[in-house]
């Protein structure tokens, strides 16, 4: 008899244990977008929700419904309601309820997608305790964006927000009138100037460096290129300033030598006594040369007058020209002007009466 009793007891315990295992289940409980895995012996949705510390209000969204039986691996979603104090374009606020977690979701849920939050961002979380949510309605404005004019009808709290909503946000050093923080009003005209700094790399010639070789037998104001050298190539990076897509300036900021240049050789005169003073009134002398000799400083027509300002040989020699060259046409422009200045000091501009007057010399 004892053996029969023990056997029956073991059978009952085994059945009870199997039932407990079968009744235990793991489900996913998602509350306001946050998911958690919970283990429970409860069977109804509402019991599992309350078991985990959440109450359900009439305004809340619960799926599946409260009385639905739950099975292992099921998912329960609870979206709790929260109050919003909605005001449109500054008018009196009214209270509405939403189960949305963000401002953007709330506007969609309330069928107010044609409005925009006046202060909060669309991604702002709506706290369970609720919040004040001033919104603005869509306005029609004229937008001149870097010369492209169009009319847009969008909801935005300010100029910067409207540009973002239009898909053309302010970037870098862009300038906008009215100011970016100015509130949007119906019929507003917005002018945007797009200022950009971009980097551009171009392959350019690399001028050769010049090696200067002194020649004591040649006048100081003269240079002779013995070897012009060979230009190389370089990649030059420029910082390019643009206004509304039009380049307004550039500065080189870096360069990389691709092909080195072969240096040039320049012979420079260092002959003593051939110093040339700085040219004064160069434009007047060029004008006189243009009148006297067609601007040709090396002219020699055989008429007894030489060079740009048409020295005769006696005047050239008397005013120190031989220190530079036997005749004026064999001297450089600067050397001829040096002798011409000596002549002017002695004879005045009257040495070139017609052409000096035409040049405006006094």
From Swiss-Prot:
One of its GO terms (molecular function) is hydrolase activity. It is a lipid-anchor. A lipid is attached at residue 24 (N-palmitoyl cysteine). GO terms for cellular component: extracellular region; plasma membrane. Pfam families: DUF348 (PF03990), G5 (PF07501), Transglycosylas (PF06737). Factor that stimulates resuscitation of dormant cells. Has peptidoglycan (PG) hydrolytic activity. Active in the pM concentration range. Has little to no effect on actively-growing cells. PG fragments could either directly activate the resuscitation pathway of dormant bacteria or serve as a substrate for endogenous Rpf, resulting in low molecular weight products with resuscitation activity. This is Resuscitation-promoting factor RpfB. It comes from Mycobacterium tuberculosis (strain ATCC 25618 / H37Rv).
């Amino acid at each position: 008899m004892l053996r029969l009793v023990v056997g029956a007891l073991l059978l009952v315990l085994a059945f009870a244990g199997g039932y407990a295992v079968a009744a235990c289940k793991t489900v996913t409980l998602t509350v306001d977008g946050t998911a958690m895995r919970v283990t429970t012996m409860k069977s109804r949705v509402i019991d599992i929700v309350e078991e985990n510390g959440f109450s359900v209000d009439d305004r809340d969204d619960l799926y599946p419904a409260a009385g639905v039986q739950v099975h292992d691996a099921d998912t329960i979603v609870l979206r709790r309601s929260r109050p919003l104090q909605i005001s449109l374009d500054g008018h009196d606020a009214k209270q509405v309820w939403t189960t949305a977690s963000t401002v953007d979701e709330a506007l969609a849920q309330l069928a107010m997608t044609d409005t925009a939050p006046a202060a909060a961002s669309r991604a702002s979380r709506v706290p369970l305790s609720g919040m004040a949510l001033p919104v603005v309605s869509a306005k029609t404005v004229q937008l001149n964006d870097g010369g492209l004019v169009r009319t847009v009808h969008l909801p935005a709290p300010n100029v910067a927000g409207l540009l973002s909503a239009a898909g053309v946000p302010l970037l870098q050093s862009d300038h906008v009138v009215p100011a970016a923080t100015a509130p949007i009003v119906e019929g507003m005209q917005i002018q945007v100037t797009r200022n950009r700094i971009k980097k551009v790399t171009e392959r350019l010639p690399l001028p050769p460096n010049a090696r200067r070789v002194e020649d004591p037998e040649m006048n100081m104001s003269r240079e002779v290129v013995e070897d012009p050298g060979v230009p190389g190539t370089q990649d030059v990076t420029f910082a390019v300033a643009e206004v509304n897509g039009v380049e307004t300036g550039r500065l080189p900021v870096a360069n990389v030598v691709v092909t080195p240049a072969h240096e040039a050789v320049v012979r420079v005169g260092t002959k003593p006594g051939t110093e040339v003073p700085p040219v004064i009134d160069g434009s007047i002398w060029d004008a006189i040369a243009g009148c006297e000799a067609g601007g040709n400083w090396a002219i020699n027509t055989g008429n007894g007058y030489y060079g740009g300002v048409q020295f005769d040989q006696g005047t050239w020699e008397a005013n120190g020209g031989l220190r530079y060259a036997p005749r004026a046409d064999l001297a450089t422009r600067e050397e001829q002007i040096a002798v011409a200045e000596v002549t002017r000091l002695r004879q005045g501009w009257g040495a070139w009466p017609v052409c000096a007057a035409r040049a405006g010399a006094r």
